[in-house]
């Protein structure tokens, strides 16, 4: 029953927040980013109230400050995509192109400047992917978030990292903030 209550309240809240922020698609990007932060806090609230989930952040003092960096995080659930927005200011997500096709949600992802890639496919479009990353890094101090294993995984899975995160680190020379997330248990 707790899982059902969580699902009802969580998804209803996400829909309400998404609808409330629809006009923000025509306003400055920072308003949509604020909506993402609210979704992160809503996610945390629902997890705590309905599922008694305690969110523990270890090593917060090690978060990179005052310079450009990217975040390489493990990806086990929807939780981290929302929650990371409460920790980092206006992150730019590197994500699979299919997410941009989701009505409303995809519009928000485009508005905040998310960088998309067609996974497992070499194409002309993907050749510009790295140029988009360079442009984003040069335009702002917003951190990039990449899930280097390329998809959500069960806590026990350990597939190899994709090449994107190492290429960003090696070729652009910006710092990497690794984050291990245990949201799948």
Where do the model's predicted regions map?
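A transmembrane-helix-recognition feature enriched in membrane-embedded lipid enzymes
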Residues: 1-56, 107-111
């Amino acid at each position: 029953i707790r899982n059902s209550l969580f699902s009802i309240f969580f998804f209803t809240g996400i829909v309400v927040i998404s609808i409330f922020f629809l006009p923000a698609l025509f306003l400055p990007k920072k308003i949509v980013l604020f909506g993402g932060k609210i979704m992160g806090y809503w996610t945390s609230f629902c997890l705590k109230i309905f599922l008694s989930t305690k969110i523990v952040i270890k090593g917060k003092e090690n978060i990179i400050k005052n310079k450009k960096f990217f975040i390489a995080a493990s990806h086990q659930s929807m939780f981290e995509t929302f929650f990371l927005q409460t920790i980092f200011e206006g992150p730019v997500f590197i994500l699979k192109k299919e997410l941009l096709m989701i009505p409303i949600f995809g519009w928000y992802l485009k508005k905040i400047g998310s960088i998309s890639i067609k996974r497992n496919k070499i194409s002309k479009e993907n050749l510009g992917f790295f140029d988009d990353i360079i442009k984003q890094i040069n335009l702002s101090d917003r951190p990039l978030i990449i899930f280097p294993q390329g998809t959500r995984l069960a806590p026990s899975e350990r597939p190899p990292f994709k090449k994107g995160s190492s290429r960003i680190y090696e070729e652009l020379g910006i710092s990497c903030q690794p984050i291990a997330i245990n949201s799948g248990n």
